[in-house]
């Protein structure tokens, strides 16, 4: 819990004032904040094997500290042997304390464990949000490498209140995300 308090305190004490002066906001309410982190795994192979969803839910719950939910298909697709309302993925939405705990764990522990890690791409969605693709779930310390049956990747989306990509980049950079290179203007 001390990490969460320190990360929130760091945002209030250091990050928010730095962003306020960098972008010349007139009010502190204009400073972008991290609203939520959404972690998603698409598991197309779950059509053939239902146990994959259960394993993925348990792994995602262990990684995030919050119960994961299965995502279901919206329509039938015969070519993929997919029927409506079949589970085809797993997702978790983190807010408040758990969001900060996960961010801390991601930046300080998980990302440095990636093989040949040189930083993450700095491509945003145009509205200040950022999605990071992870190839292997084994970078998280909660996952026992010996007990996994298959390597699964995931998408981690950082939803911010930033209005531009530049503001979102500055916010996430201040939180400690290791981007590859400085943003080119």
From Swiss-Prot:
One Gene Ontology term from the biological process aspect of the record: translation
Is the keyword Ribosomal protein in the record? Answer: yes
Is Ribosomal protein a UniProt keyword of this protein? yes
Q: What Pfam family is a match for this entry? A: Ribosomal_L5
Tell me the superkingdom of the source: Bacteria
MF terms (GO), sorted A to Z: RNA binding; rRNA binding; structural constituent of ribosome; tRNA binding
* InterPro entries, A to Z: Ribosomal_uL5, Ribosomal_uL5_bac-type, Ribosomal_uL5_C, Ribosomal_uL5_dom_sf, Ribosomal_uL5_N
GO cellular component terms listed in the entry, alphabetical order: cytosolic large ribosomal subunit
- Keyword terms: Ribonucleoprotein, Ribosomal protein, RNA-binding, rRNA-binding, tRNA-binding
* Similarity comment: family membership: Belongs to the universal ribosomal protein uL5 family.
What interactions and quaternary structure are annotated?
Part of the 50S ribosomal subunit; part of the 5S rRNA/L5/L18/L25 subcomplex. Contacts the 5S rRNA and the P site tRNA. Forms a bridge to the 30S subunit in the 70S ribosome.
Identify the PANTHER family for this entry.
60S RIBOSOMAL PROTEIN L11-RELATED (PTHR11994)
**Its function?**
This is one of the proteins that bind and probably mediate the attachment of the 5S RNA into the large ribosomal subunit, where it forms part of the central protuberance. In the 70S ribosome it contacts protein S13 of the 30S subunit (bridge B1b), connecting the 2 subunits; this bridge is implicated in subunit movement. Contacts the P site tRNA; the 5S rRNA and some of its associated proteins might help stabilize positioning of ribosome-bound tRNAs.
What name does the UniProt record give this protein?
A: Large ribosomal subunit protein uL5
Its source organism is Bacteroides thetaiotaomicron (strain ATCC 29148 / DSM 2079 / JCM 5827 / CCUG 10774 / NCTC 10582 / VPI-5482 / E50)
The record's gene field reads: rplE
């Amino acid at each position: 819990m001390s990490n969460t308090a320190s990360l929130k305190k760091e945002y209030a004490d250091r990050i928010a004032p730095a962003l306020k002066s960098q972008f010349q906001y007139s009010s502190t309410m204009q400073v972008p904040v991290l609203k939520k982190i959404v972690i998603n795994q698409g598991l197309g192979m779950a059509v053939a094997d239902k146990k994959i969803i259960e394993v993925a839910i348990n792994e995602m719950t262990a990684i995030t500290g919050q119960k994961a939910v299965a995502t279901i298909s919206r329509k039938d697709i015969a070519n993929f042997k997919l029927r409506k309302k079949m589970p085809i993925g797993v997702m978790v939405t983190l807010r408040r304390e758990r969001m900060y705990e996960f961010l801390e764990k991601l930046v300080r522990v998980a990302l440095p464990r990636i093989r040949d890690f040189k930083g993450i791409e700095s491509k945003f969605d145009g509205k200040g949000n950022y999605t990071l693709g992870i190839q292997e779930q084994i970078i998280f310390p909660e996952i026992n490498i010996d007990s996994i049956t298959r390597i699964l990747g995931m998408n981690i989306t950082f939803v911010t209140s930033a209005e531009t990509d530049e503001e979102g980049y500055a916010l996430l950079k201040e939180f400690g995300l290791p981007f590859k290179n400085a943003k080119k203007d």
